A protein has these predicted regions:
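Compositionally biased terminal segments of proteins
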Residues: 1-234
Length: 234
């Protein structure tokens, strides 16, 4: 494994313990899959968060998200982390960059899709993640169906090697279950791009991303062709 990715993942676990503290957010995405569902087949270097409360009107929800991000930054700064919130847009503060010792991780909240299909649950790091990252962490995590329903949409939309790898793990284990399919449809319908653009995207050349933003992240060697095959089978 690449040492920078390993250091980033270790930093991520320390950051997560100071961000996911009061139920405002839950973890989703690749970090949820690879550190809390799978026994760490790859490292993860960012925190993708969901705002589980779907009952609040949009403006009220955004205010709560912004407030929670600012509170997280304050907690992190008290522990010696450097934080930077990118320039706020009309949605306010929904991203936070956290740095320590030359390593940086990104926190990002999905403010478009608020709420989850299934209830959030508390989850602990898998054994391999605990041992490798030298951490012990229990935090709110989106359901298996939610994380993979969203991941399938992300893999189709972004075609990033990390997303495609996560999909290969799903195909190798459970496959697309009824629950995942239902969550996928909901996340697809909630996407900010037209459905047909997500389902039938123009295929991107992902070789550069594979070499510079993926290689060295997995516990076992992965060939680009395997990820391209996963993309073709989605």
């Amino acid at each position: 494994m690449n040492q920078v990715y390993l250091d980033s993942a270790r930093l991520l676990t320390r950051v997560a313990s100071l961000v996911l503290v009061d139920g405002t957010f839950a973890l989703k995405g690749g970090t949820a899959i690879n550190l809390f569902v799978r026994d760490m087949p790859r490292l993860s270097v960012d925190l993708d968060l969901v705002f589980p409360d779907h009952t609040l009107p949009r403006e009220q929800a955004l205010r709560r998200i912004n407030e929670a991000i600012r509170q997280s930054a304050a907690r992190l700064q008290k522990q010696g982390f450097l934080t930077h919130a990118p320039a706020a847009t009309e949605s306010g503060e929904t991203k936070l960059m956290v740095r320590r010792g030359g390593i940086e991780v990104k926190i990002e909240v999905n403010f478009v899709m608020r709420g989850t299909v299934h209830p959030v649950h508390m989850a602990s790091l898998t054994e391999a993640a605990r041992d490798t990252l030298q951490a012990d962490l229990e935090i709110p995590v989106a359901s298996f169906e939610d994380v993979y329903g969203g991941k399938l949409v992300a893999a189709m939309d972004r075609q990033h090697p990390r997303d495609l790898f996560d999909v290969t793990q799903l195909f190798a284990h459970e496959g697309i279950t009824v629950g995942i399919r239902r969550a996928f449809v909901i996340y697809l319908a909630s996407h900010n791009r037209p459905v047909h653009e997500v389902l039938f995207p123009s295929l991107r050349d992902i070789r550069q991303e594979f070499e510079h933003n993926f290689a060295g992240m997995t516990t076992e060697p992965v060939e680009l062709d395997a990820l391209l095959a996963a993309r073709a089978s989605e």
